[in-house]
Curated annotation (Swiss-Prot):
Family: Belongs to the bacterial solute-binding protein 5 family.
Protein name: Glutathione-binding protein GsiB
A Gene Ontology cellular-component term: outer membrane-bounded periplasmic space
GO biological process, one term: dipeptide transport
Length: 512
């Protein structure tokens, strides 16, 4: 609006022709090729990291995580915690506007957290916020959040990409359709969403951080085929691509116009086994399958060396992670265990995948071949985001068709609870959360709950170690690898990188 009026008055003054004489600055438009489709632009209703990463174009939280996964202030300026650990008082940044002109204030925070913590809204990320008892406005720049019980990782929850501040006016206007109409305080605002092709965002002129953003637009384009993603970089159709096909990393590194980056990750890849169903209810079967997979070979075949064999159920860079001796590759031991379990000739099963990109296909095919060597016939199905949401995340134990499920997890809060509880706590079977092994152990449940109630690091260490020791011994998973994150970008693109949880950081991105 302001820009239009300025041009109008300049024309009236007869200066438009002189302005036209100057060469126009080249638009700073960036295309980002990503490996899968988006599910929604409502961060509170997205289970996939990619949708939440793209939503960071429009949205910000009270807190965020830096590239080392440490908590930083964003829309909050600071906070205090009561002695009993139940009340968090947060001071807010002043002078921030939503993209629809509404003020960001304590009432906006309350509107968002009330929505997120209300089970009647059936938001997929409800479990992050279910411990909130109430949110109160103290004054326009102060909000008080009271918890139902102490939860020592709560600030990390507020730093999770899901905890975005959405304009209350937009929430009221669009209701359940807010996922198609994002309105936040972020550096970019929605221009176009072609649900089968791309999301394009444009610079928000009213952004509160002076001098930002530096780009005029970002187009997020899903490209599931690894080779096509790499080709788009080579031809200049894209300026950033992730993930890079591992087998093409060396080739891209030789391109003088591109920069290849291999960065640390908290992305763990694993196969869960539904322990409520035969034959996976038998611990010897689960052990056998762990012996059947040559993880070192998998690293080479599927990840071209850009991964390390898993040494636990929590990636090593997460606090309180425990490391163990990796499972050795021993197919003879695997066959022996199957025989002891009553399956001397093996069995048939299904292996589903939460991804359908080329790397996932390689993992599935490799695993299928490895299992065949010990007599297990696995029928593989690679799912897209919609299938995964319907068949895996949306069904309870009785309806679930999940047997073996290849997927990945990154603890996007940067702490141990989110690396363990959603995946192993008894109350977190689908459709509640992501315990696709349908694993249950009372001691593990007790340890995870107790760890959240204490601020004593030594006690936390003891509790998280005991829980991980039990899980590792009972083997509801086949832990596979921890990925290295390989991205590539045009050398004239700066300030755009991959976070350890596979999200994106692009606040300072610029095209030189």
């Amino acid at each position: 609006m302001t820009q239009f009026i300025t041009h109008k008055w300049l024309a009236a003054l007869g200066l438009a022709s002189s302005i036209a004489a100057f060469p126009a600055l080249a638009a700073k438009d960036v295309v980002v090729a990503v490996g899968s489709n988006f599910t929604t632009l409502d961060p509170y209703d997205a289970n996939d990291t990619l949708s939440q990463a793209v939503a960071k174009s429009f949205y910000q939280g009270l807190f965020g995580l830096d590239k080392d996964m440490k908590v930083k202030n964003v829309l909050a300026e600071g906070y205090t915690v009561s002695d009993d650990g139940l009340t968090y008082t947060i001071t807010l940044r002043q002078g921030v506007k939503f993209q629809d002109g509404a003020d960001f204030d304590a009432a906006a925070v309350k509107a968002n957290l009330d929505r997120a913590s209300n089970p009647d809204n059936h938001l997929k990320r409800y479990n992050l916020y279910k411990n909130i008892a109430k949110t109160e406005v103290v004054d326009p720049v102060t909000v008080k959040i009271t918890l139902k019980q102490p939860f020592s990782a709560f600030i990390n929850i507020l730093a999770h990409p899901a905890t975005a501040m959405i304009s209350p006016q937009a929430l009221e206007k669009y209701g359940k359709d807010i996922g198609f109409h994002p309105v936040g305080t972020g550096p970019y605002q929605l221009e176009t969403w072609n649900q089968t092709d791309f999301v394009k965002v444009k610079k928000f002129s009213g952004y509160w951080q002076q001098g930002l953003p530096k780009l005029d637009s970002i187009t997020w384009r899903p490209v599931t085929d690894n080779n096509t993603r790499a080709a788009m970089l080579q031809t200049g159709e894209a300026q950033f691509a992730f993930p890079i096909p591992y087998e093409q990393a060396a080739l891209l590194a030789k391109n003088k116009n591109l920069e290849l980056v291999a960065s640390p990750s908290i992305m763990q890849r694993y196969i869960s086994m539904n322990v409520t169903q035969k034959p996976f209810d038998n611990p010897k079967v689960r052990e056998a399958l762990n012996y059947a997979i040559n993880r070192q070979a998998l690293v080479k075949v599927a990840f071209a060396g850009y991964a390390t064999p898993a040494t636990g159920v929590v990636p090593p860079s997460i606090a309180y992670a425990q490391s163990y001796q990796p499972w050795p590759y021993d197919p003879a031991k695997a066959r022996e265990l199957l025989k002891e379990a009553g399956y001397p000739d093996g069995f048939s099963t299904t292996l589903w995948s939460s991804h359908n990109h080329s790397t996932a296909q390689k993992v599935l095919q490799f695993t299928q071949q490895q299992l065949a060597q010990i007599g297990i016939k696995a029928r593989i199905t690679a799912m897209d985001a919609g299938q995964r949401a319907a068949e895996v995340e949306g069904k309870g134990q009785k309806e679930s068709g999940v047997r073996m499920f290849y997927t990945g997890w990154s603890a996007s809060t940067g702490e141990a609870d989110w690396a363990l509880s959603p995946l192993f706590a008894s109350q977190n079977w689908p459709p509640t959360q992501f315990n696709t092994a349908l694993y249950s152990n009372k001691q593990v449940d007790s340890d995870l709950a107790a760890a959240l109630k204490t601020n004593d690091p030594q006690e936390k260490t003891r509790l998280y170690k005991e829980a991980q020791d039990i899980i590792w011994k009972e083997s509801p998973w086949i832990p596979l690898v921890v990925e290295k994150l390989v991205s590539a970008h045009s050398k004239n693109l700066t300030g755009f990188w991959i976070m350890p949880d596979t999200g994106f950081s692009f606040d300072d991105a610029d095209l030189k």
